[in-house]
Regions:
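Conserved SAM/AdoMet-binding glycine-rich loop
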Residues: 3-14, 72-74, 98, 102, ...
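Radical SAM [4Fe-4S] cluster-binding motif and immediate context
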Residues: 19, 169-227
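A short, glycine/small-residue-rich beta-strand->loop->alpha-helix junction that serves as a flexible
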Residues: 12-22, 77-82
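Non-membrane alpha-helical structural segments and their capping/turn regions in soluble enzymes
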Residues: 21, 82, 86, 131, ...
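N-terminal [4Fe-4S]-dependent radical SAM core
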Residues: 2-6, 12-13, 143-189
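Glycine-rich beta-alpha loop elements in corrinoid/cobalamin-binding modules
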Residues: 40-159
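Short catalytic helix/loop segments, enriched in acidic residues and glycine
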Residues: 21-32
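Generic structural signal for small/hydrophobic residues in well-ordered secondary structure
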Residues: 31, 105, 123, 149, ...
């Protein structure tokens, strides 16, 4: 049975950036490569002049109604959109959304236990990189045993996901991000950082891990695409 997923993100937009954020695009590339998953994307910069919360709620509900049953939602939670997401989650449940609500992103990855108290409407939390965790959640029924995935109500191990970067499809090579008329790109050749600087939230939470580099063959192909 095909499972539907609406992947949602509210980035802080910059004029130079591609319309689809790189992290969001990487997850899209993974999910769209799987025939048993029907994935739709919803990206709306929270600082866009036309951003209206009530309109966004209506648009999300409209997309969900078209996707029909057997649909989940996955949302990346950032500090600048946390209040908006909390309001959307409450709206989803008050409008009788029955699917699973999956939350990831920095506000989840860098948080300790007690996520259920902060986001009571959510069912599942993913700490760390989301590609493989989401893919497994959407292709297997019931609860899964995946490092970094926490189900609401269960004991929280507060672990991060583990990702084999060589198995992640490239959002650039898969055409998830449109390069046309795009003079600036955000390009990922590695993930992680071996340092643990106190001022930086973008270290790997809970661990000092070595850098993980993408396979050079992928990097070469992306260079050819950009050039």
């Amino acid at each position: 049975m095909v499972r539907n997923i609406l992947l949602i993100e509210f980035p802080w937009g910059r004029d130079k950036d591609p319309r689809v954020p790189l992290g969001h695009a990487s997850i899209l590339a993974m999910l769209r490569a799987m025939p048993e998953i029907q994935c739709q994307s919803f990206v709306k910069p929270i600082n866009a002049p036309d951003f209206q919360l009530d309109d966004v709620k209506k648009e999300i509900l409209s997309k969900l109604s078209k996707l029909g049953e057997n649909t989940d939602i996955a949302i990346g939670v950032y500090v600048w959109c946390e209040d908006v997401i909390k309001s959307i989650l409450a709206s989803l449940r008050s409008n009788n959304f029955k699917g699973r609500i999956i939350l990831g992103g920095p506000q989840i990855s860098y948080s300790g236990s007690g996520l259920e108290r902060i986001y009571p409407e959510a069912d599942i939390f993913v700490r760390g990189y989301g590609e493989f965790a989401l893919a497994e959640l959407l292709t297997k029924s019931g609860k899964i045993s995946h490092t970094g995935v926490h189900f609401a109500g269960d004991y929280d191990l507060e672990l991060q996901t583990v990702v084999d970067l060589d198995l992640c499809p490239s959002p650039w090579l898969e055409g998830v991000i449109n390069l046309e008329n795009q003079p600036f790109v955000r390009w990922e050749t590695q993930r992680g950082c071996q340092f643990n600087c106190g001022f930086c939230q973008h270290k790997e939470a809970g661990a000092r891990l070595p850098k993980h580099k993408f396979h050079f063959n992928r990097i070469e192909k992306e260079i050819d695409l950009f050039c």
